[in-house]
């Protein structure tokens, strides 16, 4: 029998578990589920039995791809956990999870410290202001170094860690932790069976001095956060445990500090204190307080408090296909209450929805509930129009909550069904997968007639194609990966005049526009909410020379024309268009005429604006033994890469470089063979940059030649 969802929001935690791939976050989640009584048998990532890894591909690959939502209970508190992927190709899963969470556990590998993907996920968490506690995992690993890992949190993340525990021993001799608040040791000696509670002991004599030093630092941090505590502490009085914990909680909720704990989830050491920390220090929905949104017309700012007395509002953050129920929509309810069979409004799309069943989820198992209340995470069944990032609300009190930004895909492949039956199944598969994943894109290449799918990396597309085969039984031929090139302009073209005129008897078509286009590279920090970083349209028409009902048509026409660039037919980006003037005709002007004028003026302007080709550049980090440094650097140079930093890490060398994505296909095989399998690498998308003319010529010839 499933435990009831708690109504007291003080006792609810909505948290994510985030990390670099292989830092051990799925294993940490599995242990949490075991200790909280959800799992009778513990799952292991390496044998494909992890509860939160429920897709076939996840079980095979031993990595987490989708964010499974799991509800569990610890000491009469409810913890809703989202297990997020650590592989860079799946950053969208991390992004959409963080948007709806109140707090997170950042898991670090005790040997590697902060790794590239940890940095990216940390930045994403900072973007959504998510408070975090840190868990230094794998303390039993050869080379594990707790103090090094804490230093990397300072050096690489620019964060302020607050050490809450010290490790007792390391590697095979890791036996437990020193609890710096209670000044006692908690030990799990020898091989610890799953479910074993730690033993409370005296602090080992050889750690006593270090423990006192770190407790002093902890107390100073606490005292400095509050005037009363400062007076008490510097006046020589003892601070109580409640005062210390309360101050740390406040600092954590405000993201001023990040408490650090340690252990080894796989060896069952340190998990229970981490659960206590989640409850003690991470915020509940009431700490987060009200959320902001806008009215349907975007004119008015509205707020919703985390209370069932408020009008219903929720954000859909994930779509999944359930084998029995069909489409599952994961939602975070921010205010009010929903019940099965109720009508609601999808305010993002302005469409009515009716919710069927409501579930509290445990990975891919579901527990039906009779109502979905403010502050909790649920899965809704029966929503037809809702996709990721949409707001659901009470139709009588509409609100649009802040949505999510998703990056454009950087890699594409052509996909061709093998038979006519596969063609129909492919259409269904693509539609379902695109609903689930906003970074999965589909387009028809008009000249070749091929269906082209796009994603965030080779692994991302591999998994999607694999799912088409397994879940939708689609047999298809897949082309080689193609880079998602873009085009832009380098020169401003002012006041270009274009008149669209057609007279064929009866009413004709007439629209005149005068437009300036220029390069557009805004500072992301200065963008308003919802503003694009790659396109801006400004209306500077005065005196009604173009009626206001036709202005959006000019904008739409310009955006349509940006889908096919002048250089090689790739989409145009980083353009600002200003409509300065124009003219209309009472009878012959229409929305369509102004849309066509917008398209044509853009095409003519781009031709004069020095159009260039852009390519995605990846930030690459290679970890290699020192003897292969020369080989690695030489190989990066041969791929048009630029090395911008080198550093030492855990006895190895780290090479940081920026390399065009087009040069990185097959890199893992080349790197392994040239370093006897001893080096590895990670890469994340960095930016778009202009393609050198010699390389651009090849791309243009290949693109236009293949279409000839």
Swiss-Prot record:
Relate the protein's function as given in its record.
Catalyzes the GTP-dependent ribosomal translocation step during translation elongation. During this step, the ribosome changes from the pre-translocational (PRE) to the post-translocational (POST) state as the newly formed A-site-bound peptidyl-tRNA and P-site-bound deacylated tRNA move to the P and E sites, respectively. Catalyzes the coordinated movement of the two tRNA molecules, the mRNA and conformational changes in the ribosome.
Q: Which UniProt keywords apply?
A: Cytoplasm, Elongation factor, GTP-binding, Nucleotide-binding, Protein biosynthesis
Task: Tell me the protein's name.
Answer: Elongation factor G
Gene encoding the protein: fusA
* Alphabetized SMART domains for the sequence: EFG_C (SM00838), EFG_IV (SM00889)
**What species was this sequence derived from?**
Corynebacterium aurimucosum (strain ATCC 700975 / DSM 44827 / CIP 107346 / CN-1) (Corynebacterium nigricans)
> What are the residue boundaries of the tr-type G domain, all occurrences included?
10-286
State the family it belongs to.
Answer: Belongs to the TRAFAC class translation factor GTPase superfamily. Classic translation factor GTPase family. EF-G/EF-2 subfamily.
User: Can you say where in the cell this protein is located?
Assistant: Cytoplasm
Q: Which one Pfam family would you cite for this protein?
A: GTP_EFTU
